[in-house]
């Protein structure tokens, strides 16, 4: 298996140098110093549970659909579903869900609309049993076993398996890697996995490898996931960092 330094060197060469790479990894240049600006480092603790349900729902609707359409319609989703207030969602009768699923202002997919109430119920039940917000539950879960949180969401939620749950967690600011096609291809090329991507054996091996890289580097799982993707596959787009009046000006170059 490759070390962090080897992966970093290759990604840096492909992306136009270390400073450019750090920006792509989720950091920005202020003056001559690199400052962290990564969503994975933001606290999930401050979030209310309606924001968690909103993120779950957004990723459910993005799955297998055009993301920009979901983003364009999202304000209508927020309005239609009471800004994802858990108690109000749980009070919605089936007939109301059916009517809202037929509203052209949102994406008309009844099976996905039903997940809103189902996932609200999951969150409510957990909060009731443990006397804590679901957002706090997510915040407290150790990223060194992030696959365990994935498994929880898959088991207890609806349509939160695969990459849907991980993308929602990242949207919320929870540190997690994403098993994109580039990351999967890399893991297979390094013989870290050889079976099904979502099998318990594969996920355990992947978590172990990411934990090892994190111990070597101090980078977040989010950054490491991006780093592996940048170091592999066909994404050779580079950025040039030009220092102007202590600000970082970024220009994009295509590279073959």
Where do the model's predicted regions map?
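N-terminal polyanion-binding entry modules of DNA glycosylases/AP lyases
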Residues: 1-109, 113, 227-234, 241-246, ...
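A generic secondary-structure signal for well-formed alpha-helical elements
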Residues: 64, 81, 127, 190-191
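Generic alpha-helical structural context detector
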Residues: 58, 118-121, 125, 185, ...
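C-terminal accessory module of base-excision DNA glycosylases/AP lyases that mediates lesion recognition
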Residues: 1-37, 131, 135, 139-256
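Alpha-helical ds-nucleic-acid-binding substructure associated with the helix-hairpin-helix region
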Residues: 82-159
